[in-house]
Each structure stands twice: as structure tokens, then as C-alpha cells.
């Protein structure tokens, strides 16, 4: 059901002729029918942020969003004033259809960078999507399909609070995934009665511990957007801690689904760093290992090459992550193949057949801070997908 799982939301996904793939659903519309229209958002940190990101940041700033229109088939990034005007025109069209103001409508785009969208198709698609709006499971599924690019499957989540309020969500993302968000569009909905301020606080923490801790290829997108919308339709004001927990669980589920659908990936790699002096230190170490293309290629070949793990770990400056390299241990899928900075058990003992590969690094500093990041291996198929990618 995706974004329609929570009460008070309707959605649609239609083929608007934006994508180069004929007949593909490429435009989604999500409408918050209230009674509340509270909203929160986090966006890309890329300095070349796309026109729809620039627009949607302004929309979300006042904590109110009545609708989100999303398209695949074109990023509308690096398109200057003309691209921004397209985002405004799109918001104006949707606002007119639902009886709202343009600054109540967030706009999201994903696809090829550097080209304007076929605006006539976008606006006509918005009207078609409005006509198709429904609060059904099928409508939510259609919306989740419409935002896909190189994704091989839709990614959705549905969670229910202890007293019946709900969270639903959808995300797209498969490649161009790096820390500080990624090439992903995500809409999460809830029918809980919550304020925009509470939502923003919950989403910021949830994103930091989920979307900001995955990396498929280390490439940061211009278009990342994560929106959290509340309709209040359940009439239930949730416990604050439970609300924060479920938002975090929703983001964790969606981010893991991105890793599970990484472009061409044959292994999902979980990297956990423990025994660090701080969480930031552990995170820096985990990200350094996750960024190693040499390691990712080795994992693709079912080789738990611990030398590539520690060589990447060693690139983290000591002022960022102090540790003694002679005390570091590395386990892969439960086998300690690096002991005290040197060889441990033979790496042939590691079972590399599971889809998930767990790399556990203990810095043994005497402190107990830790962090986990996720990445994928690097395969021939990843190169093939991105060599041929157009939109």
C-alpha cells in the first residue's frame, strides 16, 4: 500500500511520457487530505542541487505540504532559471487541481542531469494523476513504480503504532547512492496527530542513522529528497518516543531496501565498527571501508580480502579516529581473519555464499562507541547499467 497505508492520503502513478521508456509509469502524485497538513523534509547536500529541491526546500520550510508530485525520467538539475520555472509551474498546476496554493506543493524529480523536462507532458500527467487519485493499495503501488529509474523493484514500508496510528512510505534509489542522502526520492506518510516540529526532529535523526549511512557507489546526487507528511486522520496523538522509533524504523527499512536493490549488486555489505573513541570516529572508519572499490570488487569475487579492509581503514586521519593499528581486529561473517593488525584465521574459512556479508571491525581503543554503514559489492553489471544509462 505504500504511501496510502496511512489514513488521509491518496496517490496515483501514471505514464506521462517523461521517461525514454515507452509506456513506463513516470509521474506520481501523493495528496494529503487532512485534516492536518504537517510536513518535514531533508534534502541533498550537493551544491548543484536541482530546481525541484530548491523549490521544495522553500515549501517545507513552513511545515505544511498538501501534495507532492514526483517524476522519473529527468532530474531537472543544472537547468538554471528555466528549470526552476518548470518546478514552479508544476506546483501551480497541482495546486489548481487540488484547491491549494503553489507553496503547499512539493516537487521531486529524478533522472538524467542537465536537461529540462518535457513540461507539457509533466503538466498533462499531473492532470491524469489527479483524475486517478485513490486511497487504495493499488494506487500506492502505482506511485511507487512511477518514481523508479534503474530500480528493479518498488521499495515500500508499512508500520502500525501500538494504539493504531500508521506510517507508510515509498523510496526510489539503486545507484548514485552515497552518504548525506543519495539519488533517492522518499515520501513517508503518517495519520498520527503530530506537529511539524516534532516530525522534523524525528526525521533528522532517522535520516542520519539510515539514509546517511548507506553507500552503493559513493556518488552524491543533486536531487535527494525525503519528505514526511502527517494527515492526523487517525485522531491519535502518539507517544513521542514511539513516534520517533517508528519513523526511524521506516527509514531504516527503506534504506536497507535501497542497498538490497543496489545496481548490479550480488552482495549487501554491513560494516560495523566498534571500540571507537566516538560515534563520529566509528562512522568515519566505516565510511572509509565502504568507499573502497578494491574491497567491493573483492567481495564480488567472494574474496574476504582483509588487507583491503585495513588499508582503507588506515586512510582515516588519527585526529578523526585515534586507534592503534596493532590492536585492530577484523571479522568477516564471524571469522576473525585479522588479529591485532595482522593475519588471523585463513580467509578460506569465511563462508561468502550468503547475500549479506558482515564485516566487524574492533578498534579496541578501550572506548565503546560504534557505528554501522551499509554498501554493496561492485560487479560487471553495475558498469553495464551505468555505461548504458540515459534516463
Question: What are the language-model segments listed below?
Answer:
Residues 1-71, 75-85, 95-391:
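A structural signal for small-residue-enriched, beta-sheet-centric alpha/beta enzyme cores
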Residues 91:
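Generic structural marker for isolated residues within well-ordered, non-membrane alpha-helices
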Amino acid at each position: 500500500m505504500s504511501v496510502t497505508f496511512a489514513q488521509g492520503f491518496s496517490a496515483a502513478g501514471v505514464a506521462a511520457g517523461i521517461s525514454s521508456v515507452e509506456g513506463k509509469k513516470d509521474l506520481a502524485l501523493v495528496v494529503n487530505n487532512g485534516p492536518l497538513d504537517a510536513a518535514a523534509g531533508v534534502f541533498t547536500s550537493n551544491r548543484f542541487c536541482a530546481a525541484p529541491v530548491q523549490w521544495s526546500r522553500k515549501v517545507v520550510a513552513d511545515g505544511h505540504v498538501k501534495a507532492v508530485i514526483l517524476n522519473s525520467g529527468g532530474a531537472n538539475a543544472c537547468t538554471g532559471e528555466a528549470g526552476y520555472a518548470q518546478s514552479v509551474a508544476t506546483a501551480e498546476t497541482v495546486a489548481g487541481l487540488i484547491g491549494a496554493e503553489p507553496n503547499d506543493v512539493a516537487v521531486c524529480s529524478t533522472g538524467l542531469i542537465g536537461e529540462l523536462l518535457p513540461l507539457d507532458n509533466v503538466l498533462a500527467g499531473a492532470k491524469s494523476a489527479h483524475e486517478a487519485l485513490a486511497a487504495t493499495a493499488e494506487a500506492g503501488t502505482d506511485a511507487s513504480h512511477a518514481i523508479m529509474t534503474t530500480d528493479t523493484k518498488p521499495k515500500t514500508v508499512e508500520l502500525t503504532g501500538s494504539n493504531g496510528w500508521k506510517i507508510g512510505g515509498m523510496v526510489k534509489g539503486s545507484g548514485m547512492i552515497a552518504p548525506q542522502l543519495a539519488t533517492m526520492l522518499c515520501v513517508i506518510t503518517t495519520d498520527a496527530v503530530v506537529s511539524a516540529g516534532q516530525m522534523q526532529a524525528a526525521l533528522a535523526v532517522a535520516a542520519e542513522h539510515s539514509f546517511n549511512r548507506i553507500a552503493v557507489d559513493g556518488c552524491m546526487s543533486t536531487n535527494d529528497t525525503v519528505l514526511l507528511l502527517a494527515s492526523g486522520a487517525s485522531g491519535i496523538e502518539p507517544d513521542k518516543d514511539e513516534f520517533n522509533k517508528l519513523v526511524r524504523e521506516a527509514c531504516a527499512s527503506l534504506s536497507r531496501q535501497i542497498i538490497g536493490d543496489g545496481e548490479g549488486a550480488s552482495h549487501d555489505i554491513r560494516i560495523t565498527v566498534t571500540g571507537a573513541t566516538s560515534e563520529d570516529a566509528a562512522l568515519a572508519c566505516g565510511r572509509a571501508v565502504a568507499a573502497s572499490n578494491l574491497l567491493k570488487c573483492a567481495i564480488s569475487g567472494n574474496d574476504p580480502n582483509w588487507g583491503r579492509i585495513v588499508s582503507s581503514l588506515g586512510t582515516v586521519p588519527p585526529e578523526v579516529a585515534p586507534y592503534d593499528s596493532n590492536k585492530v581486529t577484523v571479522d568477516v561473517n564471524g571469522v576473525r581473519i585479522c588479529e591485532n593488525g595482522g593475519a588471523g584465521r585463513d580467509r578460506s574459512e569465511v563462508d561468502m555464499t550468503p547475500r549479506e556479508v558482515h564485516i566487524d571491525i574492533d578498534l579496541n581503543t578501550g572506548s565503546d562507541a560504534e557505528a554501522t554503514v551499509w554498501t554493496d559489492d561492485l560487479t560487471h553489471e553495475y558498469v553495464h547499467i551505468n555505461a548504458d544509462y540515459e534516463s
